[in-house]
């Protein structure tokens, strides 16, 4: 989703797009992925965990932020993944 409209994608594509959007939000606040201290990952299908995790791992370095990943009954617009983050903004 770049212009606000959702285009169906694989879980890997959706995860990448989601994390790229998060990266832009972080950058606009003067932060980066290293400033993320916690993430919540919500999957429409927990069977997508390994594929989502493979993409997710490429955006964070050790020590990675604390994370909770759960399956939910549904996500808006038929999306497969939603990620929220808590960030410690640099001073």
Which positions does each model-derived feature cover?
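Short, polar/acidic, helix-capping and beta-turn segments at strand->helix junctions
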Residues: 1-91
